[in-house]
Amino acid sequence: MPYPKGHKLKVRNHIITSAAKAFRTHGVRNISLPHIMKGAGLTHGGFYSHFENKDQLVMETCHFAISDTIEMLQRIADKNKNEDQTSIEAVIDFYLSSLHRDQTEFGCILPALSGEISQLSEDIRQAYTQELRRFIAFITTMAGMNTDDGYALVSSMVGTVALARAVSDAKFSDDLLQAGRVQAKQMVNIGSR
């Protein structure tokens, strides 16, 4: 019996979703294709009917993961916006929170891959760069900032999360997040004038 129409696309998207969780948690080089396929509940042999190689999967996962992050942050901004807090402040509070730091499999892929991206293929680096630019545009627009200020804000946010995840001292990690939130909000208040 043949598979229903759209089955192959559904399986492909399921693999990308599984890969996004794995790459966010373990990085690209520390995770194998068999592990990704097992996480998706599939056999390794089926991978090549969906992707040419691991690099193609990583590139498509970067696009998916940033889309996922932007959608999540937009929902947070829409839900938490009130008279006392702007949309960008709600996004900063979440992005630089212990929840985002600790739930790596659902978090932003930018800090998750920042330490290894320069050592991956040029195609992957180009995909990461394209998605970083898209994320900067999203944050810059929400903050009402110019592009240079947006570069600084996103660099600060992504770097803070990467460092907060890297350190072994929980209080120090929390302090980094708190300082990052304060700094990011100051940048928004200065940059949006």
Named regions from a protein language model:
Residues M1-K8, G191-R193:
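N-terminal intrinsically disordered/low-complexity leader segments
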Residues H14, A22-Q56, E60:
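Helix-turn-helix
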Residues E60, Q74-F106:
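Hydrophobic alpha-helical connector segments
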Residues H63-T69:
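Short, basic, alpha-helical segments at the C-terminal edge of helix-turn-helix-like DNA-binding modules
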Residues S87-A90, R101-T129:
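Amphipathic alpha-helical segments used for helix-helix packing
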Residues V91, Y95, L110-S114, L153-M157:
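Short alpha-helical scaffolding segments that buttress acidic/His motifs in well-ordered protein cores
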Residues E122-Q130, M142-R193:
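Hydrophobic/aromatic-rich alpha-helical bundle segments in the mid-to-C-terminal region
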